[in-house]
């Protein structure tokens, strides 16, 4: 990471591999949550068909499965068919995350520009023998921009933001390897990943297993992950008061999906995450958080395919609560429409969060724990987006996605004073997949 003039990015502990994606659920990291490779089986509801149909599904079954399978990014939990992939798959994805500039009337000092992040992902997955598969995932993030340093009072007494006033540059590389074993009624996977950047290093290990009922109508999934992270902040013009800190995180998940009918499927899951170590943000002036953090999330999903419309209704809900006093609700509605041009899925997501116990708009430092990070405040947010996926041939698939995220204090379900640094952003991505024997 290179700091041009004054300070570096804001930092928060990252989520582990078994933890569902955080956007709209957990206090979002300064970087956008890692969006896992969009490959067959990743981030979909496990759908099971009678064994006699597994070999050559009808066109209708293929379209039903395609429409039912999509889960929102923030709720992706891996699910796989009980056989290794029939083909080797190579995928490349580019994403762009761009935050709006801070409003001029909310700025006291520094740059109004905020983060732009370019994310490039490459993955390769293929079968090994009759019962195994292996996958390699590589992700590179390049980030530039500025971030809030602290919140103070302007001359008229209103809360305003003191920004870094500098362009921050950061590059992160993450490499992960997953091996998976398949048997008649289930599968199990083991993933090892390592992430490295100038001031942050993390190594994680994740294990998951899924198994089916005798009639293949119900699938249970459980997973566990552990991550060991090390933070070594880089000193800038604005001083950082720590040299090295560590964070350990463990996460567990259990869920079940049930085929309700030929055209409907439902899912419910429970996730528990525990972190211990350094959880404060060293690049903020007034930030001293507890050294433990417990989080629990209950997620549900429902898919209903309409044969006449050749489309499916997608409904997802998640409730989240943690030991810092934060809880939140996330509701997403989507409509996956099959057409001659592919699968088009517009979606709308609503999110509302209660502020942490120790959050203050202008943080007072005379208490054991304090923070003025807007990500810990009370607010509501709306995301509107759409994704389009099209098979160009039997070997090539392309997917495009774009979404707009807007947050406001008044949109939330909970009381709390508005944080002046609330963020709005655009996110776009393009994904190309190649399958071959």
What are these regions (language model features)?
Residues 94-100, 140-144, 183-185, 192-198, ...:
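Transmembrane beta-strands of outer-membrane beta-barrel pores
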Residues 105-111, 160-165, 191-195, 206-208, ...:
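Extracellular loop and loop/strand-boundary signature of outer-membrane beta-barrel proteins
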Residues 422-437:
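Outer-membrane beta-barrel "beta-signal"
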Residues 90-94, 136-138, 190, 220-224, ...:
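Membrane-embedded beta-strand positions of outer-membrane beta-barrel proteins
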Residues 103-104, 139-175, 219-277, 347-389:
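Outer-membrane beta-barrel translocator/channel fold
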Residues 122-126, 177-181, 207-211, 254-258, ...:
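Residues on the lipid-exposed face of transmembrane beta-strands in outer-membrane beta-barrel proteins
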Residues 101-109, 147-153, 191-193, 200-208, ...:
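Outer-membrane beta-barrel translocator domains and adjoining extracellular loop/strand segments
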Residues 132-134, 185-190, 215-220, 262-268, ...:
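Repeated loop/turn-to-beta-strand initiation elements of outer-membrane beta-barrel proteins
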């Amino acid at each position: 990471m290179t700091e041009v003039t004054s300070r570096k990015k804001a930092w928060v502990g990252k989520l582990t591999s078994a933890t569902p994606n955080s956007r709209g659920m957990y206090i979002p990291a300064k970087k956008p949550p890692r969006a896992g490779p969009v490959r067959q089986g990743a981030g979909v509801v496990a759908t099971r068909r009678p064994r006699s149909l597994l070999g050559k599904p009808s066109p209708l079954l293929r379209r039903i499965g395609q429409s039912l399978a999509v889960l929102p990014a923030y709720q992706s939990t891996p699910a796989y068919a009980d056989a290794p992939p029939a083909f080797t798959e190579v995928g490349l994805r580019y994403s762009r995350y761009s935050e709006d500039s801070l409003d001029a009337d909310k700025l006291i000092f520094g740059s109004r520009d905020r983060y732009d992040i370019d994310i490039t992902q490459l993955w390769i997955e293929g079968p090994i023998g009759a019962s195994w598969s292996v996958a390699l995932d590589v992700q590179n993030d390049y980030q530039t921009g500025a971030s809030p340093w602290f919140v103070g009072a302007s001359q008229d007494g209103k809360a305003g933001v003191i920004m870094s006033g500098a362009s921050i540059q950061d590059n992160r590389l993450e490499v992960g390897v997953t091996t998976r074993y398949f048997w008649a009624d289930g599968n199990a996977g083991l993933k090892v990943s390592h992430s490295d950047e100038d001031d942050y290093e993390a190594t994680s290990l994740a294990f998951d297993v899924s198994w089916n009922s005798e009639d293949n109508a119900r699938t249970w999934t459980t997973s566990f992950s552990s991550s060991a992270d090390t933070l070594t902040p880089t000193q800038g013009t604005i001083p950082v008061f720590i040299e090295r800190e560590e964070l350990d995180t463990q996460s567990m998940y259990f869920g079940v999906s049930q085929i309700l009918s030929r055209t409907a499927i439902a899912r419910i899951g429970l996730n528990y995450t525990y972190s211990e170590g350094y959880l404060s943000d060293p690049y903020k002036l007034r930030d001293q958080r507890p050294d433990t953090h417990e989080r629990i999330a209950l997620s549900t999903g429902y898919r209903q395919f309409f044969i006449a419309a050749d489309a499916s209704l997608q409904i997802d809900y998640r409730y989240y609560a943690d030991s810092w006093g934060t809880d939140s609700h996330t509701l997403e509605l989507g409509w996956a429409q099959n057409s001659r041009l592919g699968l088009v899925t517009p979606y709308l997501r609503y999110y509302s969060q209660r502020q942490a116990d120790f959050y203050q708009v202008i943080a007072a430092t005379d208490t054991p724990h304090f923070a003025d990070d807007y990500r810990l405040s009370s607010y509501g947010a709306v995301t509107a987006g759409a994704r389009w996926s099209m098979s160009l041939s039997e070997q090539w698939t392309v997917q495009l996605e774009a979404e707009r995220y807007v947050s406001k204090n008044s949109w939330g379900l909970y009381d709390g004073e508005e944080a002046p640094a609330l963020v709005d952003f655009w996110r776009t991505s393009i994904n190309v997949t190649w399958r071959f024997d």
